């Protein structure tokens, strides 16, 4: 699928941009690299939003609900590996009506 191939390419570019910052020794170059990282993040979101539109999905509406669901995990409970666990207040997102 074209969009999936494009998404993988954009994720690779995002990973490269993030690694460039981690490997940076000169703070003078950091601002430009941070701008590039932000651009690559936006490219990934752009492709994902395009994919959602092509499938008739309300990405922005779903994102808000998933964010609300993720915030319901508070207070944070982490497992031994540091992964955030679903706490007592967790509510899964209900995405009904967001796929057309």
Segments predicted by a language model, with ranges:
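Flexible "arm" and connector segments at domain edges
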Residues: 1-100
